[in-house]
Amino acid sequence: MGDEFPFHHLGYVCLNEIYKHLTLKEIFQLSFSSNQIKRSLGIASIPVKSIFVNFDSQYPKIKLIGESSQLEWVFGIPDGLEYTDVGVYKIGHFKFQCKTSGTAFYTEHYDLENAMLVVIRYMISIFKCSNSIITYLSIDLGVIEDSRAICENFVAFKKVERLSIFQTNYGVERNTLNFAQSFDWICDNLEIKNIHIGADVLEPKMVQKTNGEFDIKLCARRFEQVLTMDHIYLQHADWITSEDLLNLDVQTAMLIENNLTEQDLNAFIKQWLRSDSDKLWWLEVKGKMMFNREEVLKDLDVQDDAYRSLNTRWYVARRSRANPSGNGCARKKMGSLRPKLTELWPFKVYIIFGSILIVFGPAALNRMITLRRMDVETDRPSGSETGIFVSKSAVYPFGNKNEVVKVWWNIDKPENCLDWIGLFDNNDSSFYLDQKSLRQHISPVVFTLTSKNLLNASEVYFGLIDGMTGRLLAKSENVEICKSASLVVHEVKKPENINVYLNTNHGRIEIPKKRSFSRKNGSFRSSFEFDFDVEDLHISLVENSEKLNFDHFIASNQLQNNYIQSKSFSHSHVVEIVFSIEPKTSKKSAPDIMEIASSSQTPPESHWKTYLDAKKRKFYVNHVTKETRWTKPDTLNNNHIEPETPVHKRLSDRSASPRNSFITPRRTITVRSAGCPKSDLIQFFQRDEFKTALYENQDAMQIYNECSVVRHAIHRIQKDLDPPSKFENQPLFVRFVNLFADITQPLPSGWECITMNNRTVFLNHANKETSFYDPRIRRFETKTSRRGRSVPSRSSTAHKGKIDHALISKCEDLRKIAQDNFPQIAERISKKLMLIERFGGLAVASLANDLDITLALSMLDSNTEKLAGEGDNIKMFYEDMKKEKLGKGPSRLCWKVSRDRLLDDAFRIILNVDPFVLKKSRLHIRFEGELALDYGGLSREFFILLSRELFHPKNGYFEYEGNDYHLQLRPRGCETEKEKKWLILCGRVLALAVIHRCYIDVFFTNVFYKSLQKRPVTLMDFKESDAEFYKSMNWLLENDVVDLEMSFVYSSMVNGKLAEQELVPGGESQMVTEANKAEFIDLMCQKKAIRGVEKPLEILLTSFNQILNDNLLNSLESSDLKRILSGSLELDLNDWRTNTIYKGGYSDCHIVVEWFWEVIETMTNQERFDLLLFVTGSSSVPFEGFSALRGNEEISKFCIEKWGDATSFPRAHTCFNRLQLPSYNTKQQLKSKLQQAIVNGMSYSIE
């Protein structure tokens, strides 16, 4: 029964695992007052595994069980009572049992009830501390004076899985009403699933009001509470009626001392046994009455011999108050005999002597008729086999029934949680019938095939699909869907005096039929078949006297099982039928074994050989034509021979199917591609030029985007999984293909175009072929190289190793490009890019042949080429600087500066050095009070910190333009020497930052960068910095300006007054027209760029060019100069992590490293730049990304090194871009230490 209900007074509170960390001595000392302890225990160091408390017996006891010993206290034992167990000693009024030696403890006088209360309350206090639940509680409140007080102590539990609560008075009436009130409190305050209770608490006499009347409503409420529990045990249930029994909504019920009549009990048994209810699976009723078991047995068709067999094997003693232990002994025997009883008594009723009735749920049934199906499923494939395998080669989904197929797979491919197995119609693979994800399943996957999910498919297969690309990785053998089948009987085992009949819609068929068959020991071996479609089956057993003994009904879906048994209550008739269900291939019955033996002597035609399969059926094999068939070759017309499917080595029990033949009675499309030669049409889809042709053909592109069938067909043709002819029955795909045909050209020679049933058909009279594909489909010319060996493209070679990383890191840019250029497929591209972001290189490899991703790659290539061009400009610029030996001379400039007076020190040091020395010398920086060597890190930080102060708008020399906080020179006069020196210092700092490849922490407008290069500005340079000016000039470009009467004059507000300045000599009289408005706008832009800043810009450029010749900047665009000076604003976390190296025991999967990157993700962008400044000495990132981070003279990637202990702060080596990170204990500790280091760690020292 598994979880059996306790039908006797166990009387223990089982508190497992509560006292794990306490010894027996500690528990005893805590349970009683110190003045009650007379001696200490000798077993003081034994941990407790469980504790049992029994208060519902005449002699209450407490038992504690340890690992190797147990201790038992028995309260109030008479002196004359002795224990017989080994190791039990009696000392006064207290006894204990111990398997090991120990010192005895005793007490002479104590209050029994108070002692028990002390123990209970202490246990409750333990429960409160441990937040546990009571797994089982059994307590007799009859021995407790104040039972309500005891119960209220249990409020700490909140949940009691099993509760046994009684009032055993032992002949003395005491506190009955208090017990009832205690029960009310328990039901209202505790969650109880199983209850074992004296039922008299539910009687009206137990709920008397103060005036002596009965409270019927309270009684009913208590009874409803009991009925909602899973298991109940009702004692004193003499008021229970048969109607109450039928209303029981429980799993287990036990009724003791009831007054049910024989009629009530029999009626309940009959009604319940005939219902389908599975709620009540155990009922035990005890009482003085005797019910008519013969009547029940007769009504249930129970045989006398079975009942007698039962009685002789199960002894149960009558329960009586004089011998309460007798019933317990009987139950022990019952428990040991229950497995045997299940075999002897198959039905769900146990009747044992008159006073006990036990009802079980459905059990294993003894068989009267057994049907065993042969060869239903194949075994699991061996581990060495690769592919996808199925357990059945044919299924029989009769009516609304279903059949289960197991699918195994073994593929030499890395596991991907997106892969799935689909069920496909073999005749139309454009969509799946059912699918299961491999993320939630392990091999095998179980598919349930029904008529609903199979639709009209006659043959299906299972395919393993790549979740990234939709590519078919493996395909199973075909599974036949048999909607018409034959039931083949192979063997019948039965007594000789019994005839077996099958009752179907074809009539009554005897098994075996009246013909010659072998017969041995009552076993009839035969092999014959009859039509069996969707009907249910009746099997009748008839004795020779034609008296019907048994008629068993078998539903059609049961025949799909491997093993079927009928219900039986007798061992006298046992019949076993071995059968199989086969596809209905012919009206001719399969020959039996005797016929096979005789027919095998007939020589078949030449080249044909005869074989027997696993079921002893004959089939024929032609090794020349590689054909197999079930019928003799000489019985068919040679003009209509249809080759049949070869018998597979693993699925040899299925018949061949004629639909595998390529020759059919009617005219069909041939396997060859009829539009153009097969290879040409396949190559059309497989060539790379097809992608270009697709995106150039807007109509075809629309069909491709909207129809998944078309995309699926293209994929299968490209992978040589299916020929193009397979999809000719898809009009939309045919239309898609024909959109690539050049209809301006005539049809090829021998071709004709006709219309049939509103569809265009192309006829090839030369080859006598028909096709729906236009033969004028575009063909791509194959380009041949004149050279024997070709040199790979420099661009593709350079980017081959970086394309995966570039695609992963630039997914967001690709989404924007796709949205701008291809909005109709942007959403689909975005979904695939999400897969790439999630699964990285695995997704890139899987989607390499996807058309959408191919387009994304082409967009990335164009973008990459653009970036490569820009990178080439910067690389050329640095090569030119290297030739000029700028910043690489033999001399060295060692500058010692203070962080507190950085700007003053820069004025004092930089302006006092000759410009020629500045541009030729190497640079080394030292911060005052800090011991450090400059290998690049200190110089980078020097320029970052200096630029923040030097170019700050608060000084009045620069101001913010636009909304992006880019700086531009502020209009002002430069009359004082200080102003001139400030601008000279600005020019020199900018030039030195470029020479020493150090970034500054400011960004300028495009106008300023072009001014440094002495290049004219354009209108686009003002788009971000001065949006109003840009919109005004752009409006003039797009509209007619004749009516505006504008002249070549620049107007501006100076000191609150309108000031005008001619753009050209005589500009006030020269009007703006459509012909010269472009010139006007260009002049306006040039004037706007230098208006008010002529003098400051001249001073800054002079000092800048003294160090960096403007000729060197000719190879750069303004965007290049911006990247050289300020780096990139983009901070790609994926690029950062990808280009990080680890030392000292760290790796990318180390837990501390994982915490570090998780902390980085939670930081703001400003905090991340501060971290970069702390580690690298620069708060900017090279425009090439983190892969281009530089150390002293070469590339030096970001590095995380394990160093120090958990109490240390992180530290950095800015010259080598190295962060020394201790191995912290928690992520929170790492985050706190890192933040403190960034904020307070801007100083250097030498180890």
Curated annotation (Swiss-Prot):
Catalysed reactions, as listed in the record: S-ubiquitinyl-[E2 ubiquitin-conjugating enzyme]-L-cysteine + [acceptor protein]-L-lysine = [E2 ubiquitin-conjugating enzyme]-L-cysteine + N(6)-ubiquitinyl-[acceptor protein]-L-lysine
Any one GO BP annotation for this protein: regulation of dendrite morphogenesis
Pathway membership: Protein modification; protein ubiquitination
Protein name, as recorded: E3 ubiquitin-protein ligase hecw-1
Pfam families registered for this protein in UniProt: FBA_2, HECT, WW
Record-linked SMART domains: HECTc, WW
Function: E3 ubiquitin-protein ligase. Functions in the OLL neurons in the anterior ganglion to inhibit avoidance to microbial pathogens such as P.aeruginosa although worms do display avoidance behavior, vacating a P.aeruginosa lawn within 24 hours. Likely to act by inhibiting the neuropeptide receptor npr-1.
Tissue expression per record: Expressed in the nervous system throughout the body. In the anterior ganglion, expression is limited to the two lateral outer labial neurons OLLL and OLLR.
Cellular compartments per GO CC: cytoplasm
Region (Disordered) residue spans: 633-659
Gene transcribed to yield this protein: hecw-1
Sequence ranges assigned to domain HECT in this UniProt record: 914-1247
Chief location: cytoplasm
